[in-house]
Amino acid sequence: MSAKAEKKPASKAPAEKKPAAKKTAPSSDGKKRTKARKETYSSYIYKVLKQTHPDTGISQKSMSILNSFVNDIFERIASEASKLAAYNKKSTISAREIQTAVRLILPGELAKHAVSEGTRAVTKYSSSTQA
C-alpha cells in the first residue's frame, strides 16, 4: 500500500492561528515594538449603518457585539460548509457548499435574502474578474 492510501482525514479541525502579541515596552536594542493588529468588521459595519441610517451613530460596546455576531455567523457557516464538503468526499468548499450551509443555518426568509445577495455578489465578482 502507498503512504497516500493510508492517510485518514483529521478527526477535528486544526486549531485557529492567533497572531502573537507584540510587546510595547522598548526591547534591548531600544526600538519600540508595535502592537499586533486585531482584525475586525467595524469599518464594514459602520459603512452599512451609514447607508441605512446616515444620521445614526454606534457605541463601542454595540460595535463589539456586532463584530462578535458576524464572527459567530461566519464560523457557523464555515463549519457547516466543511461538514457538507466532507460528506460529499470533496476537499474544497465551493459556493454551493456555502449556499447550502446558509440555507441550513439561517431561518426562512433570512436565508432566502442571504442566498440572493450572495449569488448577486458572486456574479458581480465573476463579471469584474473577466473584464
Swiss-Prot record:
Give the sites of the cross-link named Glycyl lysine isopeptide (Lys-Gly) (interchain with G-Cter in ubiquitin).
K124
> Would you identify the family this protein belongs to, as annotated?
Belongs to the histone H2B family.
Can you say what this protein is called?
Answer: Histone H2B.2
**Where located?**
Nucleus; Chromosome
| Cross-referenced PROSITE patterns | HISTONE_H2B
Here the segments flagged for biased composition (Basic and acidic residues) are 1-19
Q: Which GO terms describe its cellular component?
A: nucleosome; nucleus
Q: What does this protein do?
A: Core component of nucleosome. Nucleosomes wrap and compact DNA into chromatin, limiting DNA accessibility to the cellular machineries which require DNA as a template. Histones thereby play a central role in transcription regulation, DNA repair, DNA replication and chromosomal stability. DNA accessibility is regulated via a complex set of post-translational modifications of histones, also called histone code, and nucleosome remodeling.
Q: Which CDD domains match?
A: HFD_H2B
- Which Gene Ontology terms cover its molecular function? DNA binding; protein heterodimerization activity; structural constituent of chromatin
Posttranslational mods: Monoubiquitinated by the UBC2-BRE1 complex to form H2BK123ub1. H2BK123ub1 gives a specific tag for epigenetic transcriptional activation and is also prerequisite for H3K4me and H3K79me formation. H2BK123ub1 also modulates the formation of double-strand breaks during meiosis and is a prerequisite for DNA-damage checkpoint activation. Phosphorylated by STE20 to form H2BS10ph during progression through meiotic prophase. May be correlated with chromosome condensation.
Q: Assembly and partners?
A: The nucleosome is a histone octamer containing two molecules each of H2A, H2B, H3 and H4 assembled in one H3-H4 heterotetramer and two H2A-H2B heterodimers. The octamer wraps approximately 147 bp of DNA.
Q: Where is this region: Disordered?
A: 1-38
User: Which residues are recorded with the post-translational modification N6-acetyllysine?
Assistant: K7, K8, K12, K17
Q: Which residues carry this modification: Phosphoserine?
A: S11
Question: What does the record give as the organism's lineage?
Answer: Eukaryota, Fungi, Dikarya, Ascomycota, Saccharomycotina
Which keywords has UniProt assigned to this entry?
A: Acetylation, Chromosome, DNA-binding, Isopeptide bond, Nucleosome core, Nucleus, Phosphoprotein, Ubl conjugation
Give the position(s) of the covalent cross-link described as Glycyl lysine isopeptide (Lys-Gly) (interchain with G-Cter in SUMO). Answer: K7, K8, K17, K18
Matches recorded under InterPro entries: Histone-fold, Histone_H2A/H2B/H3, Histone_H2B, HISTONE_H2B_site
